[in-house]
Amino acid sequence: LDVRIESVGIDFIDGFLKIEIIGLLFLIFSLIGIINAFNIVDGFNGLLLTYCLSVLLTLILAYESSSGIDWLTYIVALFFAIFGVFLFNFPFGKLFLGDAGAYLLGALIPISLIEYTFDNGFSPWFVLAVLIYPVTEVFTSIVRKVFFRKMSAMQPDGLHFHMLVYKKISKKVGFRRVRLRHFVVTLFIFSINFPFLLAANLYKSDSIFLIFLCCWYLLFYIMIYFLMIPKYAFGKK
């Protein structure tokens, strides 16, 4: 695979990325980060799979003929491959991704997006806009753990966004069946992410709009997060 991050839309940084070794290290760092982010998001039945299917579906809906039929064939094939697993995973949990499955999707989706973006000359912010959910999850987790809870960023604390949604649903709705709670959590987060993914695909060449979209998602995410997070989350563990 000839995968490269050739630009981030900032001239100063782009100059460094043109240096092959720096560009390669930045790519490796970015992929390692997003692969782990996908694993973090894989918390409940169907959650990561629904997100991946949403990404691929919006790519299909906003397909441009200039991208080539091979690209469309690949995305459709990947969509149905993931959908096959999804049918057994959601909502009854008959089949699970596991760490290996989450890492695999964490590599396939971003690499596909990077190739798609730079092969077609779309805004480099398009990749971030599509991956904004797992990126935001990791970013807020690091800030919460390191700066507020004074603990290692690698140490689990049970305060990820999907976990807080689950706790709220368990209290408010009171579903006895765990799988039904998983179902509601997945649909809730899907309803938040899908409009942003669709908007990113419709304006994938508009850097200003994509930057605004990323900022709006981050603010929206933080607003909902603060409405759910318990007070002890900002103290030491």
What are these regions (language model features)?
Residues 121-125, 142, 154-155, 207-212:
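Extended hydrophobic-aromatic, low-complexity segments
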Residues 202-237:
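Alpha-helical transmembrane segments and their immediate juxtamembrane interface regions
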Residues 167, 197-201:
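Short basic/hydrophobic patches in alpha-helices and adjacent helix-turn junctions
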Residues 1-139:
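"…together with the soluble PPM/PP2C metallo-phosphatase catalytic core" -> "…together
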Residues 140-179:
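Cytosolic, membrane-interface loops and tails of multi-pass inner-membrane proteins
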Residues 45, 91, 117, 144-147, ...:
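Membrane-interfacial segments
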Residues 100-102, 178-192:
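Select subsegments of transmembrane alpha-helices in polytopic membrane proteins
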Residues 84, 136, 140, 192-197, ...:
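Alpha-helical transmembrane segments of multipass membrane proteins
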